[in-house]
Amino acid sequence: MYYPGLVSISFRDHTPAKIALAAYKYGLKHIEWGSDIHAPCADSKQLQFIAGLHSTFDISCCSYGTYFRLGHSPISELLQYIEAAKILGTNILRLWAGRKKAADCTKEERDFLFSECRKAAAIAEEHNVILCLECHRRTYTETKDGALELMQEINSPNFRMYWQPNPDISPEENLNYITSLDPYITHIHVFNWSADQRYSLQEGVDVWKEYLSAMSGNHHLLLEFMPDDRIQSLPGEAEALLELIQR
């Protein structure tokens, strides 16, 4: 089963209230709030305000999109993000794995990153949250081999993956990534880009249908960014997402 939602950083220039209203209006019942602008982990008043929006608009926070970067951010700061996530009403946090893809890491960099990941996973298990790594270029999880190695090494139910297409590789290669990482994937960031161009999701429905057919289990499908970054484009993108889910 798929649950439609929105990543708040799609609209960094808009307020949480406006984003929550738009999500509700266009049938996106779940929001991933970003920690950089909308929901800073140290601002408990703002976090509580956002939690109130969930009741007002009958939506939920499906995840906390942090910019905590394993291997770079002090592991001692992770607890503050976990506390913030719980205020927002979610037990899922998005993290980043380093600043290099696996093939570019030295043994020392790899060993340190994995050590920090093990510490983070232990903290997640203790606090009953799930840490999910962004599937992103210029991080350890850029390639399926790097991501799979990391998942297998850490081997924790509280340490998992997001997935999103890599616009630098082919749809077939993206499908291979999904197939390899499927047991570890939680949420999906949804957009339709090439390496140098953004397109509407409607233009990519067919390839996205293939991506979803390769996945098992339940997933939140979260729109991330608009083709033109305008909130006015949300109705069309939301319509395409809902169409994709209903296929």
Which sequence ranges carry the predicted segments?
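Short acidic/histidine-rich active-site segments
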Residues: H220-M226
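Distinct, well-ordered alpha-helical segments
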Residues: T15-A20, D43-L47, A51, S73-S76, ...
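Acidic/histidine-rich catalytic cores of soluble enzymes
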Residues: Y3-P4, H30, Y64, K119-W208
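Active-site groove signature of glycoside hydrolases
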Residues: T90-C105, H127, C132-H136
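Active-site-proximal loop/turn and secondary-structure-junction residues that shape catalytic pockets
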Residues: S10-R12, S35-I37, Y67-L70, A97-K101, ...
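A short helix->loop->beta-strand "cap" motif at the edges of active sites that frequently abuts
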Residues: I59, T90-N91, V129, G217-H220
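Active-site cleft segment of glycoside hydrolase catalytic domains centered on the general acid/base Glu
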Residues: A103-C117
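N-terminal pre-domain/capping segments
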Residues: M1-N91, S156, A195, P227, ...
